[in-house]
Amino acid sequence: MSKTFEYVICGGGTVGCVLASRLSLAGHSVLLIEAGPEDYNDRIMSPVAAPHLHGTEWEHNLMTTKQPGLGNRSVPNYAGKLLSGSSGINYGLWTRGHSVDYDSWAKAVGDERWNYANMLKYFQKTETQISTTAAARIYPLREPIRNAMVAAGLDYNPDPNGGNPLGFGPFTENWKNALRQPASKAYDLSKATVLTNSVIARVDFDDPKTTATGVTLTDGTQYTATSEVLVTCGALKTPQLLMLSGIGPQQHLAQHNIPIIADLPVGENYHDKISATFFWKLRHPEKGYALGSPRFNKPEFRHGNPIEWVATVPTPHAELIKATQQDQIDSDDPYLQKPRGNVEVMVAYAPIAGGGSEFRLPMDGTHISSPVVLLLPTSRGRITLASADPTADPVLDPGYLDTETDRAAIRAGMRVALRLMETESAKEVIDGETPPPGHEPLTSACSDADLDRRVQIVGSSFFQNGGTAAMGTVVDTQCRVKGVRNLRVCDASVLSVPLAGHYQAPMYALGEAVADMLLAQ
């Protein structure tokens, strides 16, 4: 095997696979290096297996520091550790997000290539509409839940991926023929050299320490990049690799005796989305309304997540203004200019709890759930090194719910979830909320303090990490690391602000956009 390539890609995740495919098919020599294995076993490929992949060898199983916003709990945070990355272990959600988010991103960094109109072609390039839901995969509670959303005052949105997700609409997934579509299968890697089960120790630089020249693995093997090194390890692991390579905050690197190459705020600006879930007891579980019931047994129900509707809602304006004033957010901030998709509310026909939640129920067909996801967190944390050992886990401090703006948003979403189940349509099938032991059921009229206490028990990561090598401070608008040459970061680390959606679709689009930049050189 050659040790020299035009491009060396560090991380065989979603974006890494896109870049390796596009560059190699265009005739460039490409080495794609992944820390985990290449695996397509049934546990990975099944659409309903994702909850059971947490804690396995196919994930980086990380823990946050104790989070004051979550009752001083440490909660799990996961990232894919296999060829395909998180596209190989995620829940298959396919959401582009809100056009306003992309337009704000472009304005903030001063480059219109990142606005929604320009990113749309990259979404479309990676998408193929293969089907709508098969008639046999219509769940028993489809109409009662739809009617509840209407009764709760939510507007129907037939295309939440059309640039404005506000309202409620169909839940969109990217399974094909009842199988996962990992990036390494969806994109042709036949012309790329793929190296799995290989951990990168550092990015190498030339003698003046200004130009990236390749990488060194933990076993000492070195590979040379004659054009560029592309870092695509994901928002949790990319900052670790950069800092181990001398790219990061000078004072922090000095603590670990790492020679500085570029003093940049790597690991800062860390944002992640949290979720809080309600469980609802069914009036007639014997009718087969939920996963775990013997009558919830159509084969088509295993073709995707047991979810049909998703709502995206803004924080009520008066509450938003009050909270942002408390946080001293400038009135000109784009966050305040238009209604944004602050929170997502789903109804799952199973008691789906977030990773790290202290309250769980068995999947025995007696309960459904409402996951509430904070889509646009304003809280910021940081990722740091625990040591200079590349096999050690980084230290994650996301700062969950540090701002009143975030607390107001998650409360607003929780009230929507409660209001849904207080409608007459929902009450026909729902007996009520099952709260954590020792707690009373909540209502939409409960106090803010009641909601805050609940989040401290059930709040957990939704595994949508970003911002740790942010565009504008760490990389430029072409994802090139500042202060050095021939080094780019191409993953959710570059998202200086969150997007109101799940990051799978945006990361595919990001990969396509960066591939176009490289091929245009």
From Swiss-Prot:
GO molecular function: flavin adenine dinucleotide binding; oxidoreductase activity, acting on CH-OH group of donors
Alphabetical GO biological process terms: secondary metabolite biosynthetic process
Enzyme category, top tier: oxidoreductase
UniProt binding sites for FAD: T14, V15, E34, A35, L82, N90, Y91, G92, L93, A492, Y503, Q504
Keyword list, A-Z: FAD, Flavoprotein, Oxidoreductase
Keyword Acyltransferase: no
Entry EC number(s): 1.1.-.-
Protein task: GMC-type oxidoreductase; part of the gene cluster that mediates the biosynthesis of aculins. The pathway begins with the synthesis of 6-methylsalicylic acid by the polyketide synthase (PKS) acuA via condensation of acetate and malonate units. The 6-methylsalicylic acid decarboxylase acuB then catalyzes the decarboxylation of 6-methylsalicylic acid to yield m-cresol (also known as 3-methylphenol). These first reactions occur in the cytosol.
Family as reported in the entry's similarity comment: Belongs to the GMC oxidoreductase family.
Protein name: GMC-type oxidoreductase acuG
